[in-house]
A protein has these predicted regions:
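Accessory interaction regions appended to the cores of large information-processing enzymes
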Residues: 137-139, 159, 163-171, 175, ...
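Alpha-helical scaffold elements adjacent to nucleotide-binding pockets in ATP/GTP-utilizing enzyme cores
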Residues: 2-3, 40, 62-65, 69, ...
Length: 586
């Protein structure tokens, strides 16, 4: 935000939201970056192109594509926390491409900041990732983004970001592409966007040559086959937070091009005389899969406007076009689709986006994808970094290394009464752990995870222990009935909620599932009662968020997602059919 402000990208009276680059609603709500977004600023006659990338490995597909567009990286590290696991993920990708980093220690004005320790940890991180001597000789800056200053010295003048701009201009090499202006035009498409007036927009960095609006170009797929030839209708460049049309794009520029119908991400846009496609960065394979099905519950179609499988399929295909990290396959029945992706967070974001667009879906429990390596079954293992108060470290280690089949690799004091725990845990063991972790640490723990390696299958991991309370009737729940059911377990619904047969209304206090009737009213007689009736006071029901609900269910259960509600249900609503299927699966 401050780089944009201090470079004069905004008018003086322009109102700018905080975290201006996180333009998507979900990014603003969750405070994370999901999509990689380019911008550019002008500094003393030099144009600096900036690409903001996500840190979470779930959105790693965004990072891997974008790195081919830049010549250097600025790594922002919290001076109190030091480098986090997701820092490691993005940094490893950048170092592997030979990019030279600038390390900026942010938030040095926080009371618990330890910039020297954070700097040592950065150096150790780079060394462990196999950085070259040139990369290890990185310049460091101390900064406070909120106050809008950066200095080379910790006790510098603390005025503005001039020093950072100067360092970027001096340290990051100019694009090597600029020397290839006279060659034929070539560009690799890294992101796909959509503009309501112009249509599809492909963004990338011009590798060589120049491009004028109105020129005819062709699209090549990764293997070099021609997809289509098209006329470039518009060229847009990023200036501050807006895109502005330009007439000519030169080698080294980051631009968006309109006019093509079929060319997509990782394809090359080239001059008609070029025959070879450009090399695209390989993308890490998906690790989990979730089944998206039509909502076939009795309440289907009440909230959403998109309920047919055809519409859901088209929307998922459109998503796969712009998001290279997910893969979609049809299931034999035709009314469900398997979506493979990087992690629960990425799936949660996709479902949340679709739900806001008015879709109704039924979602299955996430399954981990296995891989055969040399005839042995392997599964994805993640590195988990946890910061917790000392008193909770025991229960966290016990949970991770016990039933969840993890192995503890490091444990050290993190200062201020906290412990840092690093463990390698199979992805299967982490499904649904976030909620349990928050309960165990009373909401004080911080958990970060990143893909580590494929490792031999670690054996069975038990699912949820408690059974569920299943409604045996359809209608609206009655407070009196719920009040009587409270001794049986915790409720997920309140009074006057719409329910149907086979819907899960609560968690049973024992291990078996129990069918209950939440519609049972009080029997009234014409005999006057001697005492007064007890007033019905219900305990507040547990409300599960979308991610919690998806992690909570077992394999024979589904989450029904509509624009206004998230409900849990059994896969087979009829109790006789449930018994039959349970027998068949034994």
């Amino acid at each position: 935000d401050e780089l944009l402000k201090q470079s004069g990208a905004f008018r003086e009276n322009q109102a700018v939201a905080e975290r201006a680059m996180d333009s998507n609603d979900l990014e603003r709500e969750r405070g994370i970056t999901i999509f990689a977004k380019p911008t550019s600023v002008e500094w003393n006659g030099t144009r600096i192109n900036i690409v903001d990338t996500p840190g979470h490995a779930d959105f790693g597909g965004e990072v891997e594509r974008i790195l081919s567009m830049v010549d250097g990286v600025v790594l922002l590290v919290d001076a109190a926390e030091g480098p986090m696991p997701q820092t490691k993920f993005v940094t490893s990708k950048a170092l592997a491409l030979g990019l030279r980093p600038i390390v900026v220690l942010n938030k040095v004005d926080k009371p618990d900041a330890e910039p020297d320790r954070a700097l040592d940890e950065c150096f150790d991180l780079f060394a462990s990732l196999g950085a070259s001597d040139e990369q290890l000789d990185f310049p460091t800056m101390y900064a406070s983004g909120r106050s809008g200053w950066a200095d080379m010295e910790l006790d510098g003048p603390r005025k503005d970001l001039t020093a950072l701009f100067d360092l970027i201009v001096e340290h990051v090499p100019a694009p090597a592409q600029q020397e290839r202006k006279d060659e034929p035009f070539r560009m690799l498409a890294t992101t796909l966007g959509h503009d309501p007036f112009i249509g599809r927009l492909l963004t990338g960095r011009v590798e060589s040559g120049t491009l004028k609006a109105g020129a005819t170009m062709k699209g090549l797929s990764r293997d070099g086959t021609q997809i289509e030839s098209f006329r470039v209708t518009k060229i847009m460049a990023f200036r501050g937070l807006t895109q502005q049309p330009i007439d000519v794009a030169e080698a080294g520029d980051i631009v968006s091009i309109a006019g093509m119908a079929k060319v997509t991400v990782a394809d090359s846009i080239v001059d008609p005389e070029v025959t070879e496609a450009m090399e695209a960065q390989p993308i890490d394979p998906p690790t989990i899969t979730v089944t998206f099905g039509i909502n076939d519950s009795p309440l289907a179609g009440r909230d959403g406007k998109h309920v047919q499988s055809r519409v859901i399929r088209n929307r998922l295909m459109k998503e796969a076009e712009t998001n290279v990290a997910i893969r979609i396959t049809d299931t034999p029945g035709g009314d469900a689709f398997e979506v493979a992706g990087r992690g629960e967070l990425q799936m949660g974001v996709l479902i949340e986006n679709m739900r806001r667009e008015g879709f109704e879906l039924s979602i299955s429990r996430p399954q981990v994808l296995f891989r055969d390596i040399d005839g042995e079954r392997n599964e994805p293992v993640e590195e988990v970094t946890i910061d917790v108060d000392d008193e909770y470290s025991g229960v966290v280690i016990e949970k991770l290394t016990g039933v969840r089949r993890g192995s503890l690799t490091e444990m050290k004091p993190a200062g201020a009464g906290k412990t840092r725990i690093i463990a390698h845990v199979p992805s299967r063991g982490l499904i649904g752990y976030q909620g349990e972790f928050m309960t165990d640490t009373r909401g004080t723990g911080v958990l970060n995870r990143v893909f580590h390696e494929w490792a031999p299958y670690k054996g069975k991991i038990p699912g949820r222990r408690a059974g569920v309370l299943i409604s045996m009737e359809s209608g609206q729940s009655v407070a009196f009935a719920l009040w009587n059911l409270e001794e049986r377990g915790k409720m997920f619904i309140g009074a006057q909620a719409d329910i149907y047969q086979g819907m899960i209304i609560g968690e049973h206090s024992r291990e078996n599932d129990l069918e209950v009737n939440p519609l049972k009213g009080k029997k009234l007689t014409n005999v006057r009662a001697s005492g007064t009736d007890d007033a019905v006071r219900l305990t507040t029901p547990i409300t599960l968020s979308l991610e919690e609900a998806i992690a909570y269910i077992n394999d024979d259960e589904l989450v029904e997602v509509t624009p206004s509600s998230v409900r849990l249900r059994k896969r087979y609503l009829d109790p006789h059919e449930r018994k039959r299927m349970a027998k068949a699966n034994q």
